Amino acid sequence: MVIDISRKAASFIPVFCIITKIQAIGDKAIYLTDMRGELLEPTENTPADLYSIYNYDDDLSGNTYADPAKYYDVIIACNDYLQKAKEYRDTHVTTVDDDDYRGLISSTVRLKTWTYLMLAKIYGQAIWFDDPMQSMKDIVSRTPKNLSELVDECDKLLNTGFDGINGTYNMSWNEWLDPANGATSTNDEYKRWNMMVPGYFVLQAEIALWKGDYQKAATTILGEMSRTFALAEYQGNVANIKYMRSGSYGSNYGQQYDSEMPMLTATESVIMYDYKYNQQNSLLNHFDRSGSYMMRASVPGSKRFEDTTFNPSADATAIKTSDARFRAIQEIEKDVEYAIRKYRGFRKSGHTVAHDDTYIMIYHTSDLYFMAIEALNNMGRFEPASVLMNTGVDPFYGAGVVLGEQWQGLNCNWGLWTTLYAGFRRTYADNGVRGILGLGKRDMWQTPEDIKEEIIAEQRLEGLSDEDKIKKHNDIELVKEAFLEFPCEGKTYPLMIRVAKRWNDYSFIADFVGQKYESDLAKQAEVKAKIMGGAYFVPWDLQGKSSSH
């Protein structure tokens, strides 16, 4: 995607160089976390470096997949841009537009925050630096910060920012790139430029979850969702409402991954590619059978989608669950081989292996729901957590239920019964994570009466108060749902780690991940032991000389 920005000051152009460097890391989290996670396994074509990731090897020196150098390239570019943009503005005070400056600085602050958050989630450590550097060689003598320290630094950066500008300012690319039409521009390409950078609210919500500040996470995420649902453009007869699992979201499930361009209503932020401008990743080459086919879905991971115990069906008599999300996986030979087709196309293909320019979503509608449910559950607001996981607000609210204090942050704009605009009632409303797909209810506990004795031992809930039993059980149910919702997005392993840290119990990670090694019991035991021993992060010696640069 190339747009003429020659009319703008040349000092602002480097922000696009940051985006280019982010394109280079867009698919890394998928290879690094999902290959170690609950679903993916090698094929006959898997290279040695990727096999080492799958095998949980302790020494990854020189491993081209594990090398974090390209993440640090983004940080170096962010620091360089921040310094040079300030220097330029300081010498051109009267010619630099204040709103543009705030928007560009704030966007860069958020990109840097997101990059460090990714390092924290993948490696559990990173070297933090704010001063200009040229390469990783300039920082290897510094002491790395651990996960908790990095999350604190991300929170500080997001809210303190640079040059008095924090991460709350938005850059309106519509107005910057299409000044003739300004904010009223209907050009979808420009609107997608607004999704190049994660928003403040979604970064703040995820950071708050890592810090255990569930009130802030819930207030932040629910506030933005409710605000968006109330916009005039989403009232009345609208099939797709931004950030809402409603309308055609379920019947058209999958197009948010395989359409030619990202869906505006389902996407919060996205990494875009265009092969015509040499902007590519290698997802299709890794996953597609017409490419190098280096990774595939394991049999145990694939069978979870149809397992009525793991994934309840709406039909109590069904012998297997029909879940639209299973379209992400292609059955090659039943119970033997399953390939990933999530990025190739469920019904039609908008991308090819030769082009390999499928976009990679950073945050989308599902992320917001899962963060909201996680926050609500750990605040003890079990009723709305269960409703958002299952049927959604619409049928619950429409039943005439009087919403109590637990529902703070969710309002009538999630439903349709009291939402009127220009004489129209909203046609579609929230149907929840599972309800929009016509699935059965996941067993989200709400009261001590819901606690099942047979689950206490299975999920290691012994010794916890009833309230904590409910919270931990629901957290594990959220993780199980994430396996179905986020295959091959680089998101399930970090969620498992966050839940495990919360309860100081890593056994469920070992259990879920270990299932895909069932054909090699010795390897299964080895991997489970490593996870229980703390090897859930990708190991990398930041003080060593094994980095590519």
Spans of model-derived segments:
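Surface-exposed intrinsically disordered loops and tails
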Residues: 163-190, 234-264, 399-470, 521
